Amino acid sequence: MSIHIAAQQGEIADKILLPGDPLRAKFIAENFLDDAVCFNEVRNMFGYTGTYKGHCVSVMGTGMGMPSISIYARELIVDYGVKKLIRVGTAGSLNEEVHVRELVLAQAAATNSNIVRNDWPQYDFPQIASFDLLDKAYHIAKELGMTTHVGNVLSSDVFYSNYFEKNIELGKWGVKAVEMEAAALYYLAAQYHVDALAIMTISDSLVNPDEDTTAEERQNTFTDMMKVGLETLIAE
């Protein structure tokens, strides 16, 4: 057991999907995994291990924001030996070419957080995805016929930002979307020498306000990213 995860050693696979919403973790376990067993209910942050196409895979919620995902990802890596971590979550489009329900693979993550500067005050350390996972996910998504964008995202510490126009401006610099977790996940992956990737479904748009989705849709219908994430985890 770790501080926030109740699993025993051996109950968590070395490859895992990380949705922010614990109910999305439950949905993935019930709809994609065979023989799924719940290994964590602490703080209702559900985690499950099962098989996908014969491969042992886990899925666990992380909550919202970089502090929350940092807790769970670090414990999964350090205490349970997880080697491949793929975030599957939602994001808001910052780019007029990126639309609701399309996928974004975060090649890198800019951030307004001090999560890196706390360790490296003299550097702007780049938070980047594992190229191996990114390459596999891109080709899998293309083979499945999914509209997929690859590029930078903004990982924000603030959901209700007072710098809305500044965020929009980033879209003009090629930033695809804004979310709240990828930079922290990538930083931990670099620190502990594991592979990480963030796959997001666009749930709303900051540049096209008429494009949005319901809370139920966000929880239960964004299955493309789940398929891509699982296929990427088991790809050789």
Swiss-Prot record:
One of its GO terms (biological process) is purine nucleoside catabolic process. One of its GO terms (molecular function) is purine-nucleoside phosphorylase activity. A purine D-ribonucleoside binds at residues 4, 179-181, 203-204. It catalyses: a purine D-ribonucleoside + phosphate = a purine nucleobase + alpha-D-ribose 1-phosphate; a purine 2'-deoxy-D-ribonucleoside + phosphate = a purine nucleobase + 2-deoxy-alpha-D-ribose 1-phosphate. SUPFAM superfamilies: Purine and uridine phosphorylases (SSF53167). The record marks 218 as: Important for catalytic activity. Keywords: Glycosyltransferase, Transferase. InterPro entries: DeoD-type (IPR004402), Nucleoside_phosphorylase_CS (IPR018016), Nucleoside_phosphorylase_d (IPR000845), Nucleoside_phosphorylase_sf (IPR035994). GO terms for cellular component: cytosol. Gene3D superfamilies: Nucleoside phosphorylase domain (3.40.50.1580). It is an enzyme of class 2 (transferase). The active site is at 204 (proton donor). Phosphate binds at residues 20, 24, 43, 87-90. Its EC number is 2.4.2.1. Belongs to the PNP/UDP phosphorylase family. Homohexamer; trimer of homodimers. Catalyzes the reversible phosphorolytic breakdown of the N-glycosidic bond in the beta-(deoxy)ribonucleoside molecules, with the formation of the corresponding free purine bases and pentose-1-phosphate. This is Purine nucleoside phosphorylase DeoD-type. The lineage of its organism: Bacteria, Bacillati, Bacillota, Bacilli, Lactobacillales. The gene is deoD.
